[in-house]
């Protein structure tokens, strides 16, 4: 790295876990009572706040998990208007060994062999560092 270059800074927004939270209760759940469900509520979307206010100089990547690639690419487009650098999409059944890197100007599949000892995240981060 050139000594005048600043190191790359990236934020990754994990899918699903950042979409919902447990609905707040006003009292403790009594352990003697039976219950069979937990209510979830949507959390506010914070991508615009990250890109505009908190971390405007950082490359922000959002994850999108879907059941088919066409949905991933279509849904990814809305994130670019919110200032993200890219969207990392994965399909439910292939998520451990294949991702789709969606940038404003290109879409690229990144994959490893299913039985490979490496992890897709390692390959993905190396790819992003080389952008």
Regions found by a protein language model. Name each.
Residues 1-92:
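Glycine-rich phosphate/dinucleotide-binding loop and adjoining beta-alpha-beta core of small-molecule
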Residues 1-6, 84, 91-131:
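Small-residue (G/A/S/T)-rich helix-start motifs and N-terminal tracts that mark the onset
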């Amino acid at each position: 790295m050139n000594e005048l270059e600043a190191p790359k800074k990236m934020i990754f927004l994990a899918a699903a876990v950042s979409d919902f939270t447990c609905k707040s209760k006003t009292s403790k759940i009594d352990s003697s009572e039976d219950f069979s469900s937990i209510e979830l509520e949507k959390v506010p979307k914070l991508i615009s706040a990250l890109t505009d206010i908190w971390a405007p100089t950082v490359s922000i990547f959002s994850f999108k998990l879907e059941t088919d690639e066409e949905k991933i690419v279509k849904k990814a487009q809305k994130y670019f208007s919110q200032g993200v650098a890219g969207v990392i999409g994965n399909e439910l059944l292939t998520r451990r060994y294949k991702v789709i890197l969606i940038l404003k100007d290109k879409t690229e599949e990144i994959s490893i062999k299913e039985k490979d000892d490496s992890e897709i995240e390692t390959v993905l981060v190396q790819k992003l560092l080389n952008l």
